[in-house]
């Protein structure tokens, strides 16, 4: 989500590499490619192509087009929509970053839900998630994540410096017009705020590195620091208490809510419904966008290892891509695609897609389908390229169709169903 802001900075900082610098980042030959059709991605303009740990960790073969689909508009006119989720009856909650919750009826009509706190700070990125509890049908509970100003900070003086991500719980009123009984569960320094609810009911929340901390990896020590929430996946109970089995509970100086560490800018989060495991999508700096299968207590490397570069084009930490005790991504893209929301498909309308991971793509303006063998990617397909729209989110609907959210002003929710 920091990409738009960073564009102007990057443009002013990029310089031509000297021959020596170019030699320093030129990788050795990669492992043999997987068999199959050519990958979707072209190489980076300067030829940079970091060496993967295994064939298929990047630039997987182009997946076969196994399903035709039709696209219909469910609702439109959203401004800065960042997330959407389904209520049990099929209606849709939409979170807009400027600070609005929208409710999409089954007829496609859009209404606004009032009651967001006035402390929400849109310039710090605003409203991120609006997600119903797994037991919403009986408790009408929803969870929110949004940014507020740090205590004592001046919004005009600190337009993009570190915000505070708030995780809150509230009730949706019986008439669906407002949220009530809002309770703050957690305040975490950083930005981001994607949220998923695990099968055991616990809440998994992301907190990323704000743009205001700088553009070089040396400016980002927080993802490796257990006394900071930045660059982490956090885990709390639905009442805001800390699960006793969190990995760093009781460790001196560590935040007990930390579940996993070593991330830069998580943009998507989902639970694999078949395994119950958490998966994330992440923006690298210049290249090195990642998909990770996240486990409790594990370290995902940033900024010590990674498959991207500084915005100046120089290597990060000597171009290091592996280190003992740090996890490898399931998949990465270089050059970057700016992945956003992600979701697994398990429905019956598209049998050929069952078990596939779908990734909303901002830069390439497509919906990415990753075919998997366990936790290894074996194919990649780009969908919806004909729309030429930035895709912000993707979810399977209760009807088994696939729904996507487009980005920006005039955003839409689209429904993908099999062609008649």
PLM ranges: what are they?
Residues 18-21:
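Sec/Tat signal peptide C-region and signal peptidase I cleavage site
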Residues 263, 377-398:
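Conserved blade-ending motifs and adjacent loop-strand segments that build the rim/top face
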Residues 111-125, 182-192, 229, 238-259, ...:
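Surface-exposed loop and turn segments in beta-propeller and other repeat-based domains
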Residues 162-175, 221-239, 293-295:
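Beta-propeller blade signature
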Residues 195, 202-260:
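Internal metal/ion-chelating core segments
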Residues 5-16:
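Bacterial N-terminal signal peptides
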Residues 23-214, 268-271, 276-284, 335-373, ...:
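Acidic, Gly/Ser/Thr-rich repeat motifs that build Ca2+-stabilized beta-propeller blades
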Residues 254-290, 295:
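Repeat-solenoid scaffold signature
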